[in-house]
Every structure is written in structure tokens, then in C-alpha cells.
Amino acid sequence: FPTRRSSDLARTESLYDTLFVTSDDEPGSYYPLVAENVRYADDFSWAEIAINPRARFHDGTPVSARDVAFTFHKFMTEGVPQFRLVYKGTTVKAIAPLTVRIELPEPNKENMLSLFSLPVMPESFWKNHKLSDPLSTPPLAGGPYRITDWRMGQYVIYSRVKDYWAATLPVNRGRWNFDTIRYDYYLDDNVAFEAFKAGAFDLRVENSAKNWATRYIGKNFAKGYIVKDEHKNESAQDTRWLAFNIQRPVFSDRRVREAITLAFDFEWMNKALFYGAYSRANSYFQNTEYAARDYPHADELVLLAPMKAELPPEVFTRVFEPPKSDGNGFDRDNLLKASKLLDDAGWVLKNRQRVNAQTGKPLSFELLIASGANDQWVLPFKKNLARLGVTMNIRQVDMAQLTNRKRSRDYDMMQTLWAAQPWPSSDLQISWASGYIDSSYNAPGVKSPVVDALIAKIVAAQGDKNKLLPLGRALDRVLTWNYYMLPMWYMGEDRVARWDKFSLPAVRPVYTLGFDTWWYDVNKAAKLPAERR
């Protein structure tokens, strides 16, 4: 299987077991793994978790409550800053050899459940290593797989643990069916694609609509050796956006952000570049009932009315829809609307260039994108902006630089993936709340009392759908109508190509590809060329 060389190490999650595991079909459900059982307060202010006495690391040593407490403190001191922010004031203590107690500074169901997914790492190994340190040998682990071979930046091989302690637990039945899994790292996606067609690896998830429509051809496809599998994704959808860094003066005015959005001709791009494969993003809860796809209901208005003076008027009177064009490549109406917005914001046209009416400074910004990314849309977007007198400079950097600049918010605009949420969760704090303004998840740099107030209510309403429904829709309206990010697209289907040597369960999971439930099919493999079996 392929991955980008600069990506996080593939499948590291299979090295460590978690206290509980979630279901790929049931959002919000947790089943015991390292944990044997749990008792907790009705308000989720504390929990005591009993560790399964059978749980073992790969060296045979038992998993203890001390390992759980150690892992939490390791993440608090060496993990990402967001973890420390979320769990500030939380205590995790071993109160018995196989019992750990978690206490939150205040009741919070979402934060407690997130800790139920904590991977358990062995104190015996990690007390002598930092999470940021490069390792010359694989770490001691405890999950269904261990690393058995690797070459830095080229490949890593995972082998199934034959005496894995949890192999027969109900949560693992039918899972982890491959003896060996190898991941190869590629710098260039085109090279990776050709390698896949030639049989260098077995499975490819395709994110390019053009590739899917035009390049999956040749003898191996014609003979049925490679199978193209496309099926509709019915779950909450990941969506693509362009984040405006609203901390930069150029994008501090909502009218400028809306004008830039009007210049993004999705309809033409989708027809000319993407073979009609994408749908336009229009919500941060895409494909869920929490998306604000109707006029505000009375319960939403009750939430929004006290903050009316701080909100765009459209929040109360219109349903958010991104601007649409006729797809011919020159949308005069949208460009005229954009021009008017720029004029109103104090950016006037002078010698075919937008300049600040007071300072004479030209309206220009930099789009930061990853080298080798799908960037067909960039030049048409740049051309449309030029028609408005706006200059968009393009800066391509490698993934390491992109990550560093994202973390330091050193960009004007950058593409971002908004990860799907099946319901409005406490995780929204990290992405939008003022208390997390330094979080790299808050790509636009939003600091809004209105957003803070809604998210605080969302956190307090966890588990109460009657309250979450109007809160989620109200937040969706506030975020979209403020144009903190420019909505790009999403792909409503999963597209996977594979060499035909695998079988899959008849019922697919809703929220993932379910690769951990696939298995090697000897009969199918026998029909392939000998070197590809």
C-alpha cells in the first residue's frame, strides 16, 4: 500500500491497544478492549476503569493501571498542545494495580469518552524515550501488529502478532486478517499510480476525479486483475475548504472574503477539470441533519437573536449557498457582485489593479499549497481573481514546510480538509473557540464571542440531541455566513482500486473502508499472474 513519504507512519494505531474501541457503524459507542469494565458518574465527571488482567504487551508483561496513567501524563507533557489545553486540570491515577481513576475538572461527557480511546503505551519503554525522538528500533508495543522491517522514508512492514492477547475478544472477531502488511512511501503520486498499475502494491484510494475517469485503463483492468470499486458514502462527509487567515489584515474584512469566494468558479472547474465528480461543500456538517439547509427555526432564532448585532444579517434571512455559475468559464454576474463588495470594503480599481483607497497598497495575497498536490484549479482561480484586479501569488512547499507554516499560521490562504463530524461534539472547541486560537486546527484564526457562546452551549448539551440540533445548525449558519473559509468540494463516493485478491464482508461499515475486516482470498489470487498473487 502506498503513502506519501512525509505522511505520518501508516497503521501506527495497530501497534497499541486502546482502553475501549469505537464501532465503524455506531458513532458514540464504545466497547472494552484493554478495559474490562468501567463505572462512572452520571455527569461523566469521573470514571474508574478496570484493566483486563489478560492484557499484555508484546514482551509478555501485563498492562497495568500505571501504564495508563503514564501514557496520559506522557501526552500531557510531550504531546500536541491541543491535548494539554483540552485536558488541563484532568487527573489520571492508578488507584490499584488494575484500576485507573480519571477525574475531570468539570463534567464533560465528550472529554471523558475521548480518554476512553487513549492508546496504552508501556512505561517500561517510553520512560526512557521522548515522543519526539527518532527511534533506531521499533518501540515495544501491544496491539495486533508489530513492526518487523523498515527503511526510513521508503517502506515499513507490519507483521501480525501470533500470540496477540486480544485476538479472540468480541471486538476483534473478523479483524486483523493479514499476516503481513507493507506500506511503501512515494514522493510523487504519479509515480505511485504507475507503480500500482504495474503491480508494485495492492490497494489504492483515489482522490483525483480525473485520474479515476481517465487513467484506470490498460490490460490489467481489461482482464479484471484490478477492480475499480466505487460506492456512495452515506455518512458525514469530509469537505475541502480554502482557509482565509483572518488574522492577516488582507482578510480581516468579511466583504473581501465573500468577494474572493465569488471568484471561485466551482461549476466550471467541476465540469472542465473534475468530470463532474465533486459536489459543492455548503456546510461544516455536510450530509448530516445538523447542516443548516433550511431557514432558521424558532429554536435557532432564540439562540441567535441576542447576538444579532454581531452577526451578518443573512444568518436570519437566507439559507447559505455558495455562489453558482453557469459553468461557461466567465461568470460576469458573480464578478460584478465581487467587484461591488471590494469597492464597499475600500479596495478600488486603479489601472486594472485593486488598491486600498487610503494607502494605495495593492490587494494581493499568497496561496500556500503542497508540492505535488492536485492543483488544476489554482490557475483558473488566479485568472478569475485577476479579472477583479486581485493578485494571488502561488507558493508550493513540501509537506514538512506546509505543516510548520500551518502550525505557526504563516500563510494568507491555504487548503484544508474539514474532517466530518456526525454530530456537533466538544471537539469543535479546538477548531473554533477563542481559547484555542493557537491551535493549528483553527486554520482561519477565528476569535469570536458569538462562536464561543454557541460552542460552550454545545459542550454543555452533549448527549441531548434536542438541544444539539438547533445549536449545530445555528453554529453552521454563523460559520458559513462569516466566510471564514471558502467552500470547495467533497466527493460523495469512496473510490478504491485493488488487485483482485481480497474478499470483503457483505455489509460494509458506514464510517470507514473497513480494511481491517478484509482477508486474502486464495481462489481469487489464483486467477492473477503468478507474480501478483
Predicted segments with their positions:
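A structural "hinge/loop" feature
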Residues: F1-A10, Y31-E36, T61, P107, ...
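Gly/Pro-rich hinge or "lid" segments in bacterial periplasmic/extracellular proteins
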Residues: V21-E26, F116-R182, L187-V191, A198, ...
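N-terminal lobe/hinge region of extracytoplasmic solute-binding protein
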Residues: F1-D42, A50, H73, L140
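Extracellular/periplasmic solute-recognition and catalytic clefts
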Residues: T91-A94, T148-S159, D184-R248, R255-A259, ...
